[in-house]
């Protein structure tokens, strides 16, 4: 599916959120962003870009970027980690999928920076042990990494409304910041801020979906090119898929 042909994205706006602890992004990411910035106006999309640099606590950086989104008029927040490479159409696809109000989180699945093809996502299975797809390629998930994640603005707004006690005063920026991304000890062990955020979004009624057709590069000493569909999903899909509208 070509998102720009199947959905009308005109008038939509997106906040590109870049947490970059070491004040730099990969050259490939810079080129990807430039290409998306060229493509977006052709689809009537407005862009804002925000970054938090030098913050060693990634959950704080993400929360600050959420507040930046909320102070903007943008419809979506797009988290992109500083070591992720993508194609401009990948963001257009996620925006198209995210036009469904139920799909609060839609993401590509990054590969870890290792020779083993390990991916950072937990898919959702029903009571019969079957996966759920939307009939157009998306797969429902329980949790996914924030490395390349689109979030509807309403997810943040409704989470804050449900939990006003999560706001805290950030002295450095002199603002009240929603603590939506956090680390937590659970029965499963130590849970990172990305998985906990997905749990919190699902608790207030939003769905989490992943697009296995998106191939992301993950930069390290070398580029670890991922293909979640080919490596993980498609080999297991035939006996364990249930389509939903």
Predicted regions located by residue number:
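C-terminal catalytic/acceptor-binding lobe
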Residues: 1-11, 15, 163-245
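Conserved donor sugar-nucleotide recognition element shared by glycan-biosynthetic enzymes
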Residues: 58-62, 194
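Short, Asp-centered acidic motifs that coordinate Mg2+ and/or phosphate
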Residues: 76, 103-105, 208
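Active-site nucleotide-sugar/metal-binding loop of Leloir-type enzymes
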Residues: 63-76
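Conserved catalytic core of nucleotide-sugar-dependent glycosyltransferases
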Residues: 66, 87-182
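Short beta-strand-to-loop acidic/aromatic patch adjacent to the donor-nucleotide binding site
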Residues: 73-85
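N-proximal low-complexity "stem/linker" segments adjacent to membrane-targeting elements
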Residues: 1-56
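Alpha-helical elements of Rossmann-like donor-binding domains used by nucleotide-donor carbohydrate transfer enzymes
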Residues: 32-35, 64, 93
């Amino acid at each position: 599916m070509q998102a720009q042909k199947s959905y009308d994205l005109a008038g939509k706006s997106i906040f590109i959120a870049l947490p970059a602890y070491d004040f730099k992004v990969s050259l490939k990411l810079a080129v990807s962003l430039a290409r998306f910035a060229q493509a977006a106006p052709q689809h009537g999309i407005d862009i804002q870009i925000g970054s938090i640099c030098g913050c060693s606590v990634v959950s704080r950086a993400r929360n600050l970027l959420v507040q930046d989104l909320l102070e903007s008029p943008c419809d979506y927040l797009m988290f992109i980690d500083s070591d992720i490479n993508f194609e401009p159409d990948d963001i257009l696809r996620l925006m198209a999928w995210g036009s469904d109000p139920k799909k609060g989180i839609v993401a590509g699945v990054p590969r870890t920076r290792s020779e083993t093809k390990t991916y950072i996502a937990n898919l959702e299975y029903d009571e019969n042990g079957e996966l759920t797809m939307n009939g157009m390629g998306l797969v429902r998930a329980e949790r996914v990494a924030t490395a390349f994640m689109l979030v509807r603005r309403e997810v943040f707004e409704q989470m804050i409304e449900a939990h006003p006690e999560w706001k805290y005063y950030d002295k450095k920026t002199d603002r009240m910041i929603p603590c939506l991304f956090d680390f937590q000890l659970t029965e499963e062990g130590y849970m990172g801020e990305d998985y906990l955020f997905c749990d919190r979004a699902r608790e207030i009624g939003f769905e989490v979906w992943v697009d296995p057709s998106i191939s992301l590069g993950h930069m390290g000493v070398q580029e670890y090119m991922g293909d979640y569909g080919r490596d993980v999903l498609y080999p297991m899909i035939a006996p364990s898929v249930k389509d939903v509208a």
